[in-house]
Amino acid sequence: MKQKRSKPAGLKKKAPYREEQQFVSSWISSGLLIPLLVILAGIVWYGFFAIHTNDVSGSDDREYASIARNIVNGKGIARNFVYPIDINFFAKFPVPEFMHPPGYPLIIAGFFKLFGVSDRAAVLPSYLSYFILVILFFYFTKTYLKLGTAVLATVILIFSRVILDVSIVALSEAVYTLFFFLFFMVFIKANSLGDIFLAGILLGASHLIRENIYPFFIPLFAFLYFYLDLPRSKKMIFFALGILVPILPNILRSYIDTGSPSFSYGKFVLMAFTEKYPGLSIYRDIQNPSLVDFLREVPGQIFIKYLNNLVNTFKEILSNFNPCLLVFFIVEMFYWKVNPAYKRIKILFLSLFVSQILFICLFTSTHRFFIPFLPMMILFASEGVWRLSNILAAQVKVHWRRGILLLGRFAFLMFLIVPTAHLIVTSKGPPQLGFKIPQTFYLIPREEAKKLIHFLDDELKKDKVVWTDLPEILEWEGNRFCGWLPIRIETIYEIDKKIPVDAILITNFGTAVRPLGEGWKELLRSEQSLPQFRNVKLYKSWPIFAKLLVRDEKNKE
């Protein structure tokens, strides 16, 4: 009887991804990956941290830190800084904080309680968020994708310039990104009413860190309606109740402080950056405009603003996110022959991402609102590279496959990590900042801010209210009550009827970064004073030149 000849083992076809999985497991066990990735994250993060300034140095940073200090000092969730528009709602310091949600200042206040009030304590939540995000991201990715893809994606996340930028500042982006990703994890894995309730709590908590829940209502409730094998009405109710748990205390606070359970600056944000109210001018006037009148009189301005923001949003994303990452992310979004669990992740992400673009463009166009989506974009791009390299490797001879796989993935990795690695190794900042690079959204050096505060303390008592074009400096470094200068000089006298104007501080820095009315610029350049503010003091230092006008004693009541 003729025996059947068996094929030599070497001629057996192996799927490229199987070869790669064997390669990954041959040199390291998955149990060691987490500590190794955390060590890599620590090295990269510290290198990035070491070449940058390490203070609370931006505008919003200082506001968050100042509010947190007020919380620790028992003054409540309040700020020492007022806008001219605030005189329509509040008449004394400190002013209840509704410009920013209270969640992030409360987190910073917790760190102030533990470590004392300092710049470093204010930035600690962002530091920690980076490392926690790396760990959660790896676990989530390896749950739904191959181990090799999870490692590739996590390394890219570790080297992400955008994520690193927000991890060393006291802005809310890093903490919000962590909460949003945690919510996404819980929501996509939910298979019980308890899981849905927990997802609602996490979404509500993220809303207290950044008020960004509104774009997500329609896609999330639509997802609940069509997915998850649970009673529809119960899913909706449990999710809504979960959202309300963290939000209800803030609604109660709003009612106590303002008499309205839903007090908001939302209408001003909507009308700002239009032809009628260019830039932030709407906040720097004492008139309280009607949104209904605005929409009736100039409805086209909102439409033009929306279109401009839509175009600028894509420009912001393209200029701030790695182009190579975006290409593979978009390619992966067109591939839908995937398993049901991964398809659900894609559907949920895309619905949230598109809804965010369409909604946020009503108000602004900054890329900061899309940073929370970046981890998932990295996940999809990494899976796209993994799949395309498998397809490419399948077209070549067997003995070339491993080389093609490794070359493709290594090239993708290099495109994404080399820019950050090069920055860490070679970059130096200006000598005035100790050869360190300014943090993202940097305002002025901390030492210069302190010098300006010393000048003010020498000239004014601590309880005097100063109206200035650099209120964040006075609020955080100076810990004194202050206001933002209105557009017109004469408005100062109207403001004084409700909130004291003890002094006026005009700076060359503030007038350059935030254009004031021509009257203020002329006042800074000339030797003139103002009626009732004839006592003039000058401050000169790099990079600030300032003019202080102190109210005449005889004109004070």
Regions found by a protein language model. Give the residues of each.
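Membrane-lumen/periplasm interface segments of specific transmembrane helices
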Residues: W45, K234-F314, L318-F328, F415-T426
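Short acidic/glycine- and proline-prone juxtamembrane loop motifs at membrane-interface regions
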Residues: V162-V175
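Hydrophobic, aromatic-rich transmembrane alpha-helices
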Residues: V134, Y225, K305-K343, L350, ...
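Membrane-embedded, lumen/periplasm-facing catalytic core of multi-pass transferases
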Residues: L406-L470
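Signature aromatic-anchored transmembrane alpha helix within multi-pass, membrane-resident enzymes
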Residues: L33-I39, V155, I201, F217-I218, ...
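Transmembrane-helix motifs of polytopic, lipid-linked glycan transferases
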Residues: A121-L145, L178, L182, V331-F334
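Membrane-interface transmembrane helices that cradle and orient dolichyl/undecaprenyl
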Residues: K142-L145, F183-L198, S206, Y225-F226
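Start-transfer (signal-anchor) and selected internal transmembrane alpha helices
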Residues: M1-F48, K142, R232-G242, L406-A411, ...
